[in-house]
Amino acid sequence: MRVIGTVGMPGSGKSEAATVAANAGIPVLVMGDVIRQECRDRGLDPAQHHGRIAQALRDEHGPGAIAHQSLPIIEDHLTDATTVLVDGIRSDVEVTTFRDAFGDDFTLVHVSAPRELRKARIEDRDRPGDTDGEPLDAREDRERGFGMDDAIDLADVRIENTDSLDAFHDAVRDLLAADTPHTEVPDNHD
């Protein structure tokens, strides 16, 4: 059993890493999907209310609320798969929740890219929530407020996403294929 979590600032490549995992047949739990479902359950448009509902869930149920809501989904995936990727961890409390639940079978991967590159990627992609008018600075500040920097500091592995898309895909595939969950992967695959 392996549970691989990704952490990183907006536009770093977390969703792209999840796509690589999904293409390899690995179940992916997108923590943002938990929030989007909560928006719908509250009769709100996820594209317009994602950030506010993410904060509301944490205010109402504690800083680990989204991770706790994710655990049964992950455990369900693990009945049929040996590896699950959790996309989009936002706080050290969420990291602790997953480490408590899965112990040494949990690996946290920091997907890293410089701010200007991330900003350009966000501007180029067409994803709900990216165009809701929230500037990148505000979004980063909100995520830092959740404990993003502390979560990043807890990462077991870092993948630097500054090269080509193919190189990044190779790095993610190397991590997914590693014999041990905490195997360091090279930052560059030239």
Curated annotation (Swiss-Prot):
Segments of this protein annotated with the region Disordered: 120-144
Superkingdom field: Archaea
Keyword Transmembrane: no
GO molecular function: ATP binding
Pfam families for the chain: AAA_17
Residues that coordinate or bind ATP: 8-15
Keywords in alphabetical order: ATP-binding, Nucleotide-binding
UniProt KW Nucleotide-binding keyword: yes
Family: Belongs to the UPF0200 family.
Name the record gives this protein: UPF0200 protein VNG_2452C
